[in-house]
């Protein structure tokens, strides 16, 4: 918050007046963050040579956060789910909706991998996407806990194996 106040040269009360309230500002931040992330990930999926390559690279990107930051912060959406889902029903629904959008993107990648013959088509892509989204959330928690690179790599390998 302080970075935002410094960048805008506003006080807290002025910032909240511009956006309606602290709650509305937070909701707008989640929407903006998730829209930007979704567009980026969707473009990544389109650019990858296969659906499985997208899934693999996404898992590795999450696992490698430990190498990019001394204090990994995780994902804004995942952190918000953990922090707010019990306390605020409206925010909980916004976060669930955003999560489902990402699950749909993963389902698209899984379906593509199935069509390409890289994953078995026995399983429902949407159900596998829920598993993958949950696995990524757990992987992010492991990264934040500073689990070793070797253990993170093993989690990635097992997650990929489970999708087959």
Predicted features and spans:
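Helix-turn-helix
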Residues: 1-24, 28
